[in-house]
Regions:
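Well-ordered alpha-helical scaffold segments within catalytic/enzyme domains
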Residues: 1-3, 41-55, 93-106
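Carbohydrate-binding/catalytic loop surfaces
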Residues: 24-42, 72-98
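Low-complexity, Ser/Thr/Pro/Gly-enriched N-terminal "stalk/linker" regions
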Residues: 1-38, 49-73
Length: 106
């Protein structure tokens, strides 16, 4: 496998992720300001693979700041505020994947 070649080919996707990360650390799913925790975590995995640690750390901090006392996170955010006021049980534990990815690289 030519790891460097694949990383190079996917660099535009990484640039898109970085461009769509807001100052609060959330990573927008689209240009309209939507952010959902599942897609956010997938973007964190990419940031870890590319060792973009500043953006990665901001994204992890955003995720944990938005967990409630029960360890759940709202299903969707729009322009930095919750827009769907319910929880999907698989969103909160998904953060383990970007954390594990980072631990494998560090």
């Amino acid at each position: 496998m030519n790891w460097d070649k694949y990383k190079s080919l996917l660099r535009p996707a990484l640039d898109w992720i970085i461009k769509n990360q807001l100052n609060d650390g959330s990573i927008q799913w689209d240009e309209k300001g939507k952010c959902d925790p599942w897609d956010h975590c997938e973007c964190l995995i990419a940031l870890a693979i590319y060792e973009e640690w500043e953006a990665y750390d901001k994204g992890v901090e955003w995720f944990f700041k938005n967990l409630n006392d029960d360890g759940l996170i709202f299903s969707e955010y729009q322009n930095c505020k919750p827009s769907k006021f319910y929880f999907e049980c698989h969103h909160a534990p998904y953060i383990i994947f970007p954390l594990k990815q980072a631990s494998l690289l560090n």
